[in-house]
């Protein structure tokens, strides 16, 4: 994401991408137009998306009649540009990074929730801090305008505080972790593997994690309207394959970690740290996510996420989430 608000420095980096970069078609030149006989899907470095390679290697795509070509993006922002410019049929991206394009009227639809971050992102504090009240006036390191920024804003709001109650220190994730460990800041918003490493070292603990904000950090499969119309069979088959993938990860996590770790050049043991903090969505969880009546559905959480994006001028206009959600493919997959 070096072309976004900050540079990507490691694996598992997700950020809020501005709509203007998306509309510019960043990275478009590196991806060819999708072939008629396949569905071309962008994948970046996050467990819920790397899991697609489990589906590929275990034959779940073929089993469900889906001709899928996974396209790896080392730079997550590039994948969003490729989808927006029509060079992908679908892409792996966050709900927050989909609302910007929707506000601009791009013809995109969320068709599957792969996962929610459920502990991989955390607000880490020193051993002596036991309450949010003790954070008032303290230095908190994070990557500004990132998912980490959103996590902190949510954590403070849930505990009767505002961002102005703390002193923000804008650092890359790696630098934020180092600053926290060395005592230069009082707290830091980080993600795994730093969260688990700091806990094991005894230098800090999570006072709030993404597990405490269910539904607000969803990772999705987002498709072009045109692809939904012309390649519906493949996309429905892909959703069916996902449910087999989720079951495989749940029942055989060691084997899944072995497959996924190779994609990102890690050891299975290193990769296993990420699985507990990722809530992979099965059919039941997806059914709820696409039901607008549910409190944690995509429709219900969109205004909360959009408010954060608007406050920091990360999107222009007001996104109509109802135009960016299509649950009919999920319904077809469950028939």
Locations of regions flagged by a protein language model:
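Solvent-exposed, polar/charged alpha-helical surfaces in well-ordered, non-transmembrane soluble domains
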Residues: 59, 81-85, 109, 133, ...
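Secondary-structure end/capping motifs
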Residues: 229-314
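Conserved C-terminal helix/tail region of periplasmic/extracytoplasmic solute-binding proteins
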Residues: 303-335
